[in-house]
């Protein structure tokens, strides 16, 4: 079985030899056909610690490196996309403020 290769944005580089990569995917709703966006965060191994916040990277599936880390960074696609990181942080902040209030706005 071929290994998964995903492309995403580095949203955190605060851990040692690890980056958090946000991967977004789009798919049509099976019944209504509306395009739906979903995102997921993956922990990826970065042994040289050369990838920084905002970098667009490719990650590839690998053997388990730790409890949650099953990908490693393959290559840098584009550097310095801080606009994507800011969108993610704003969305996360809005979600956290909604959960503190106990529901939807």
Curated annotation (Swiss-Prot):
User: Gene3D superfamilies from the entry?
Assistant: Nucleic acid-binding proteins
- Biological process (GO) annotations? translation
Q: Which UniProt keywords apply?
A: Ribonucleoprotein, Ribosomal protein, RNA-binding, rRNA-binding
Q: From the UniProt record, which GO molecular function terms apply?
A: rRNA binding; structural constituent of ribosome
Q: Which CDD domains match?
A: Ribosomal_uS17
- Entry GO CC: cytosolic small ribosomal subunit
Whether Translocase counts among this entry's keywords is no
Question: Which InterPro entries does this one have?
Answer: NA-bd_OB-fold (IPR012340), Ribosomal_uS17 (IPR000266), Ribosomal_uS17_bact/chlr (IPR019984), Ribosomal_uS17_CS (IPR019979)
Q: Which family does it belong to?
A: Belongs to the universal ribosomal protein uS17 family.
Report the NCBIfam families cross-referenced here. Answer: PRK05610.1, uS17_bact
Could you give the subunit structure recorded for this chain? Part of the 30S ribosomal subunit.
Write down what this protein is called: Small ribosomal subunit protein uS17
Organism this protein belongs to = Thermus thermophilus
Q: Which gene encodes it?
A: rpsQ
